Amino acid sequence: MRVFPLLAVAVLFLGCGARSGRVKPEGPESTVAVPDDAELRRVQTRAKYLFDAERAAIFATDRLLIQDALDRSRMEWFFTVPREDGWYSLFGTLDDAGTFTPAYAFKAPRDDAEQMAPLPLNELPGDFSPVARAVKTSMLATVEAFKRGAINPVVFVEEDGDLTVYVLQGTRDPMRFYLGGDIRFRYSPDGRTQREAVRLHQSVFAISLEPGPEGELYQGSAHSHVLFGGPLETELATLMLYPELSALTVIHAASRIAYFLTPDGAIRVLSEAPERQRMLKPDGTFGPLDMEEEAAPPPPSGQVDL
């Protein structure tokens, strides 16, 4: 079954890097960690969360911009975070003591972010200062690392109460997108102690979907920007947010495995070894590959010619 024509495929050469849930591939020269099934499921699940949180933030920003008499001096920091009863998007300031003062707030059901609506500040469920502290530290560090100010924070509350903050590159141009330039941070529940800062890509690179001088469409590019042996949640989430990119192939030549990501959240594993080829479907279950040969990049074999 043909999935779609490959009009836009971004191909990333990966660098070496190890993380939990990844197993070392066979072979004396193999040093890159290959994600196992559990890790691929984790990537997909977290990518879906990033997608949902970003959509909630986008709808909140849209609602904010149609408000009358906006006081932008009171909108220094912004973030969207879930609570049991919905998404909360807040815009406000953070003082030197780390106290967050919201200026504008919005709320939407967890399962319907498009219903984002203004919320009176006195109806906010508690203090959001811990989240604001973590977001501020993360955003400042990301700007310092990648020298680009158009960024978006995504907050995930861990089971133990720790705050994980992803900072992703943003775009306002419907024909230009940015991959890389992302960092994952983890903080104590009060947002004051940074436990982890993991740089997910070495740099930022832009992808333009504008036709070329002779009308040719974007077909793909090769970059060396990924530090891990398999796909990351930020990569899959970016593709889900911007389906115009059509597909993203993540590959590490040492592992001889390619991961073909699509906007529906699927991850297809391509390998020389037939027993390794499989597909993590959008519903989180594994199955056989389901696309025709011409609809996918060939599995890597030795030196990959991109």
Give, region by region, the residue ranges found by the protein language model:
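Short helix-loop boundary/capping segments
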Residues: G180-S208
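Short consensus segments that form the blades of beta-propeller domains
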Residues: D173-F177
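Short beta-strand elements that form the blades of beta-propeller/WD-repeat-like
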Residues: V165-G170, V250
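Short gly/pro-enriched beta-turn/loop segments at secondary-structure junctions
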Residues: Y178-G180, E216
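Sec-dependent signal peptide recognition
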Residues: R2-V9
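C-terminal motif of bacterial Sec signal peptides marking the signal peptidase cleavage site
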Residues: L14-G15
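Active-site-proximal loop/helix of nucleotide/amide-processing enzymes and allied scaffolds
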Residues: G27-D160, F205-L306
